[in-house]
Amino acid sequence: NYDSYGNEFVAYDSRNYVMDVDAIETWLKGKSATDREIACWFTLAINEISARYGAQFSTNSLVVYFGSKSWYQNLGDDPNKIRSVFTSAEKSNFDNFGRKRNQYCKKLGISSSAKEYSYEDFNYIANNFAY
């Protein structure tokens, strides 16, 4: 999905609305997303919220993925410290996306780290499952 400037986002409305993670999960399953793809979607959506505020990522796949987005500006900010500037909807979405991601990672037996995914994984999710 795109904003009014044509910028692509995997969870476009996460800034303005508390998104229903169960509805997103159902939608992803309806599009035949695998459990790993669903975990990847929630991982990407979490990091997308931080990226909007100029988070500096240390995971190479996130560095490359967000570096390819025209809207992203690396301001050198620690993703863990910028939470204070999130909108209330973003704070809720960040937490809710994290819980859902953790459920899937536990089910899959993988860590919840973005290091589980490549740039190609994130790009595939963005191109096929933008909500």
At which residue positions do the language-model features occur?
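Post-signal-peptide mature chains of secreted/extracellular proteins
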Residues: 1-131
